[in-house]
Amino acid sequence: MDIFHAIILGIVEGLTEFLPVSSTGHLILVSELLGIKQDDFHKTFEISIQLGSILAVLALFRERLFSGVDIWLKLAVAFIPTGALGFLLYKHVKALFAPSTVAYALILGGIVFLVLEWLHKDKEYKINSVESIGYKEALAIGFFQALAMIPGTSRSGSTIVGGLILGLNRKVAAEFSFLLALPTMFIATGYDLYKNSHTLSIENLSALGVGFVVAFIFAMIAVKGFLKFISRFNFVPFGIYRIILGIIFLFYLDLI
């Protein structure tokens, strides 16, 4: 992988990792368009740029994260379903990975967002701060996050949907989703890096480093912009976007 490809994929990862649109789907499509070889190193590269995106959330929310143990306890509770199911079903989840799965998950997730916004258009949300989230809500959101083990579902998408159903307002649902990414993705990416460490070499460290830094920068931009957007608008544009992207996926990859 050359530096140009590393920059492009870093931008795509950073912009999409925390939006409810499936970063996996975007990385697959862009890699196909650029003709990037889907080898073992490519998998390791994707894991490393995910790590860059995660660190952006740590940087942006550092004050809240270090304000007390309560938030960490809630994140730990929310992580339990994904941690347990991920450990038990790791091989089965990896076997689900296919472009067709991603495409259909994108479309279905888009429909869910549209239906949810229609049903909740006049709803008064009962939880208007991350601090007001209870442990039961945290655990329930954790089960929604487990759905993201299906490729294309989007981790942020599934947790935001869960938050909205449980009564979190849009911004709080997004913020808790971002915070929950920290334990979830640190552990998942750490394990995957360990499993794929044999693909690392001196020759490809520059691409890894560039992609990591680019993903970090663009993830910070995306998270800030997304929170501003969702404070004023709803998730309908993301639902429509997911459906369109899923259809493009199906046509481009000759799945229909």
UniProtKB/Swiss-Prot annotation:
EC number(s) from the headed UniProt entry: 3.6.1.27
Transmembrane annotation, as ranges: 1-21, 41-61, 69-89, 96-116, 172-192, 207-227, 233-253
GO biological process, one term: regulation of cell shape
Membrane topology: Multi-pass membrane protein
Catalytic activity field: di-trans,octa-cis-undecaprenyl diphosphate + H2O = di-trans,octa-cis-undecaprenyl phosphate + phosphate + H(+)
UniProt keyword annotation of Hydrolase present: yes
An example Gene Ontology molecular-function term: undecaprenyl-diphosphatase activity
Keywords carried by this UniProt record: Antibiotic resistance, Cell inner membrane, Cell membrane, Cell shape, Cell wall biogenesis/degradation, Hydrolase, Membrane, Peptidoglycan synthesis, Transmembrane, Transmembrane helix
NCBIfam families according to UniProt: PRK00281.1-2, PRK00281.1-4, undec_PP_bacA
Role: Catalyzes the dephosphorylation of undecaprenyl diphosphate (UPP). Confers resistance to bacitracin.
Miscellaneous comment as given in the Swiss-Prot or TrEMBL entry: Bacitracin is thought to be involved in the inhibition of peptidoglycan synthesis by sequestering undecaprenyl diphosphate, thereby reducing the pool of lipid carrier available.
Protein name (record): Undecaprenyl-diphosphatase
Natural source organism: Wolinella succinogenes (strain ATCC 29543 / DSM 1740 / CCUG 13145 / JCM 31913 / LMG 7466 / NCTC 11488 / FDC 602W)
Lineage, broadest ranks: Bacteria, Pseudomonadati, Campylobacterota, Epsilonproteobacteria, Campylobacterales
Name of encoding gene: uppP
